[in-house]
Structures are given as structure tokens and as C-alpha cells.
């Protein structure tokens, strides 16, 4: 029989152990509940993402990609425009998340794709400037830094991290969105991205290409711009290399060259793509692409987007694409993303995206 003192020691030990277990459980629960970073000052919500050797990238985020998070059910990968202002892109999508009560459950990621003139630190990726506005990252070209990683491989690697069940076990939806130059990136990544079809069961990937300056067409036909209904299509008689990538599928870059053209053409209609167009985005000023290749797609961004949506209806009778026009908005990312139409595209309700018959 235990002596009273012994019984007291055991009782004390039991209570201490129980208290420790309770404290550990509470600490574990507290660790599981992570507070999103929602500051919009430069640098506050910024981290460095290491994708491989000599392949670092700065990105803004609400939650870190490196820590397990059971709260996250949605992810938004937002691509900046020609100005490479990742903070502005992050803030614009964050505002849309706040307006739709999607902050706590959404990881918002805004990577920055620098060019050489930005003089990024050693070990960071950077791309070429090309002609001043046609930066290589917009079309998924290889970086010209020590690691020649494709800009589309960056998105693949980010989606691969999101796909880790041990890190984001409750993820259900990923939206890739970009405006202007970021819209160009988004449309072309929707065409050829390699990681999206590898996402685990139950994770849906969507794309929102907002006011891109040009599109990658899937064949050699272009709209007869004299027909405002976009029902007339023709192969242009021109010396202009209008069907070379990034405007068509001829002479694609190394990333897309890994996939047979027939596969690109077959898979693109099956991907859930929204062409988000500003009703007033009809100016040719600023960084507008006025090349002959682009002008054969339309004379302004609204016309180019409307024509490309009609192209999908004409040549791909079954697809998961939709054209959405935002009334009263021109070329402004914040207004586009925070319109009712923009919010619905970035944070869609469950379901949708079924193959539909065009016409």
C-alpha cells in the first residue's frame, strides 16, 4: 500500500503532466492558427523564395509558403504588370479578398519578376528587357541570370508547393490572375503550364487574364476587323511574322517547346480561363503593343480580348472559357480586380467551369 506522501507525489506528478499536456495542446492549436500579413507598406509582407540554386525571387504574401497552414482553402497567384510592382498587385488582390471575406482562408502570393536593369542581388532570377515593354518574363522565357529558369517554371514551382498536402491540406482552389503584362503571362501560362494538371484531386486551378495586350493564338487565323461581330476569320496576307510566339505557336520558347503543339491546342480549351476586359480599355497610349503582330489581333485591348474570345467560340466549340466585360473601367488593375465582375472571377463560388458548347 502506498504511503500518503507517495500518493501525494504521484498525484502532483499527474497534475503537472496533465497541465503540461494541456499547455502543449493549447500551444499546438495556437501555432495552427496563423494571422495573415495584410500590411501594404513596402517590405512588410515580403519574403524571399528560393526555388533552386541561384533561383531566388522576392514575393509578397499573406501567409508564408514555407509553413504548414490548415486555414488555407484558396490561393491566388497574382502577376504584376510591366512596371513589376508586386506590392501594388498584392494590395489590389488583398482589397478584393477583404471585400469578399476571403482574407483568413486565402494565401495571396505576388512574386516579382525583375529585369537586368533592376540590378537584383546575387542569386536572384532576372529576365531580359527586350524592346523596352516586351519583357521576357511575360511570355515564360528563360531568365538570363545564372540560373536560366523559365518564368513559367516559377509558377509551376509555386503551385507544387501549394499542392503539398502536408503544408496546405485543405486547399481547394487556385486562381492565377494578372492585369496587362500580368494578363499576358496568365493567358500563356494557362496555355502551357505543366503543374496545373498535376494538382492533387480536389484542387481546381483557374486563370483570370485581365486586359492583356496580346494573346497567343492556336492557329493562323485572325479576325477580319471590318466585321464587328468577329464572325469573319482569315489568314492574313502579310510579311509580318504574326504567328510567331508570343502571338502564335510558331517558334515557341524552350518551356513551351517541351509540349507538342497538338497537346497545347487540345489542353487549352479545357482550362478554366476568364478574359476580364475593361469596357473603356480602348486607348493605344502608354505601353500599348502597336506591333503588326498585335494589331492583327485588334486595334485596342478590348477589341483584342473580344476577338480572342470569339476565336475560342469559332474554333473550339467546347471550352471552359468566358469573356467578362467590366463596365466603365479602362486600363486600371485596381478597378478591374475590385469590380463585382473582378471579385467574382478571382474568388468564384464553388462549381462552374464545365465544358460548354460555344454558340
Predicted segment positions?
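A domain-start/cap signature at the N-terminus of enzymes
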Residues: 26-75, 83-107, 132, 136-147, ...
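Conserved acidic catalytic loop of the alpha/beta-hydrolase fold
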Residues: 153-171
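Short glycine-enriched nucleophile-adjacent loop
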Residues: 183-196
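C-terminal catalytic histidine-bearing segment of alpha/beta-hydrolase fold enzymes
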Residues: 276, 289-290, 309-359
Amino acid at each position: 500500500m502506498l504511503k500518503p506522501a507517495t500518493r501525494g507525489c504521484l498525484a502532483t506528478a499527474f497534475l503537472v503532466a496533465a497541465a503540461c499536456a494541456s499547455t502543449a495542446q493549447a500551444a499546438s492549436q495556437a501555432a495552427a492558427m496563423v494571422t495573415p500579413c495584410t500590411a501594404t507598406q513596402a517590405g512588410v509582407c515580403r519574403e524571399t523564395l528560393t526555388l533552386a540554386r541561384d533561383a531566388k525571387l522576392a514575393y509578397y504574401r499573406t501567409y508564408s509558403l514555407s509553413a504548414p497552414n490548415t486555414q488555407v482553402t484558396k490561393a491566388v497567384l497574382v502577376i504584376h504588370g510591366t512596371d513589376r510592382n508586386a506590392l501594388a498587385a498584392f494590395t489590389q488582390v488583398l482589397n478584393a479578398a477583404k471585400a469578399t471575406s476571403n482574407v483568413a482562408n486565402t494565401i495571396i502570393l505576388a512574386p516579382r519578376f525583375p529585369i537586368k536593369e533592376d540590378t537584383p542581388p546575387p542569386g536572384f532570377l532576372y529576365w531580359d528587357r527586350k524592346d523596352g515593354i516586351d519583357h521576357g518574363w511575360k511570355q515564360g522565357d528563360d531568365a538570363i541570370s545564372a540560373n536560366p529558369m523559365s518564368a513559367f517554371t516559377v509558377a509551376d514551382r509555386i503551385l507544387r508547393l501549394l499542392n503539398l498536402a502536408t503544408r496546405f491540406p485543405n486547399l481547394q482552389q487556385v486562381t492565377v490572375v494578372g492585369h496587362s503584362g500580368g494578363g499576358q503571362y496568365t493567358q500563356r501560362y494557362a496555355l502551357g503550364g505543366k503543374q496545373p494538371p498535376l494538382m492533387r484531386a480536389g484542387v481546381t486551378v483557374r486563370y483570370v487574364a485581365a486586359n492583356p495586350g496580346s494573346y497567343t493564338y492556336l492557329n493562323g487565323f485572325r479576325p477580319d476587323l471590318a466585321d464587328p461581330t468577329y464572325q469573319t476569320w482569315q489568314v492574313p496576307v502579310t510579311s509580318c511574322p504574326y504567328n510567331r510566339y508570343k502571338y502564335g505557336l510558331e517558334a515557341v520558347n524552350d518551356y513551351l517547346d517541351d509540349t507538342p503543339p497538338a497537346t497545347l491546342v487540345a489542353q487549352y480549351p479545357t482550362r478554366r480561363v476568364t478574359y476580364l476586359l475593361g469596357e473603356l480599355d480602348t486607348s493605344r497610349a502608354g505601353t500599348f503593343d502597336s506591333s503588326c503582330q498585335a494589331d492583327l489581333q485588334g486595334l485596342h485591348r478590348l477589341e483584342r480580348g473580344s476577338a480572342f474570345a470569339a476565336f475560342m467560340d469559332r474554333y473550339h466549340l467546347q471550352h471552359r472559357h468566358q469573356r467578362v466585360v467590366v463596365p466603365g473601367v479602362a486600363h486600371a488593375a485596381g478597378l478591374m480586380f475590385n469590380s463585382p465582375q473582378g471579385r467574382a472571377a478571382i474568388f468564384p463560388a464553388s462549381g462552374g467551369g464545365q465544358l460548354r458548347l460555344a454558340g
